[in-house]
Amino acid sequence: MGLSHKERREYGRSYKRDNNRTAPFSCWPRWIRPGGWSGHGGMSGTTRTGVTARLAFWGGWLSPCLSRAGEKPSCVRTSTRTQIITCCSRLTCSGLPGARAGWLSGLCWRGSGVLLLDGHFAAADEAVNRKLNRRAGAQPATGEMTDVRQPAFRGAGTVNALARFFHGRGPETAGVFLGKDEQGEPVLVPRDTWRKTNIQILGLPGSGKSVMATNALIRSVRDFGDAVVYFDQRGPVAALLPAHCPNFTLLDLRPGKPAQLNLFRDLDQYALKNLLVAGFNLSETGHVADHYRISEQKAAKLIAEQVSAGGKHSAGAGGGVRAAGGPEKGREGADHQAGERGRPERPADGQRHRRGGDNQRRRLLYVIGSMDDEAVIRVQKMLFARCAQIIIARDEFRRWPHASIMLDEIKYLLSKYVLNALGTVRSRDCNLRLAHHAGRLRAAGQDLPADFVKTTVLDNTPIRWFYRAASQESRSGAGQTGEIRVDVERRGPAGRRGTWSISAGTASSRRSRPLFDVNTLQHLLTGSR
């Protein structure tokens, strides 16, 4: 084999560590002199290095035993493929028949041993030598990491998510079904964790994140009696929800639809001012542009005072700006925004809904918004701010039904109310479910720094629900799942020259890596999380 004494010793230690037992004698290479017994024969002056159980058995064990029995073999010729034993008589016989009888019995003993045991030892030799050849083969300089996980992805298969939502006893009644993982196994979130934790859902368009989130929310309403407010920008599941949620309310904010909601009904001036600040992005950012925002905030305050006093909010918008004494740019911006918002905010008679009644047990409010109409986007922001106001106004010493607020495509709903609600509504038995692409958090509102938005969302969403990602920025979310320690082995250039293996040495170290790397997220099948 050409292995050095150090390599043979290292192999023995690794064999004992991996198999929890010492290596068998066939695994211990040793210097064997096949002709070393007598010094005669053509192989008496040669030495060989190899892992050969037959050499160790016949040369190291059997021959001394036969020598003690009275036989003195002179030469044993051995090869690595076959074993040919030739015994030459060097007996100093004095004509005694017993000496020759002992020699013949020893020869018969050796012959029967070759026939019966040689095949077994040959198979053991081949297995051990094959393993050693793989270890001593040529290997380029590389870095390898070991990990306990085996990311062997299976087919997603067909999953009837609603079929898993059954009534009765069993493990499924105590958890919320989210889908299947990369191994094809169901993922269940315990009920206690579901009602105490905000969840962030990330994935490509069409990966199934909205569908599975809808299934989870249906179960929350139907089986657990939760109240759900669902903000959706497209409305693809509006026809599915009434069949599973009897207390279903649809609020369509798309352009061309009749007014269905009065956001300003029964509001005091402070709550109304906060709605205007959230809808028009009037929060201070710390930049020089805050000079104009302060004037616009004064205008929003005056509008709120006039509305609470009985004036019309649409007519009082311009007067409020002028009364605030703001600069010309501030007056123009507020007049334009108030004009854009005047029509959708005015409800039609007989179609008004009071938002406070929607937070009852087993109710689902489904809001269809828009991703391109600025007026509708502002209404969405103010509607969520109103939901947060209702939740925060709950009596903390009273038991309320759990509420879940689903924000699909959070980019079009981002405001300071959303970020503050991640931490404030949890104390009122309410949690948020945020669905978006990883890069969409950077496209926040003009009053929200992108880094501040990203940090706040990550810190307040312990559960991250990942689907298949394509872009590098989306795959970077894998680093948010925590890290594990792995072993890194670096080997120098290695090669083989004849029967000798040459190696420059190895170095082992430990390093950290994400629990789920980018390859895991990129190769998830459709329907897996």
Curated annotation (Swiss-Prot):
Q: Which superkingdom, per the lineage?
A: Bacteria
Q: Where is the composition biased (Basic and acidic residues)?
A: 328-356
Q: Which UniProt keywords apply?
A: Conjugation, Mobility protein, Plasmid
Q: Where is this region: Disordered?
A: 311-356
Functional summary from the UniProt entry? This protein is essential to promote the specific transfer of the plasmid in the presence of conjugative plasmids.
State the protein's name. Answer: Mobilization protein A
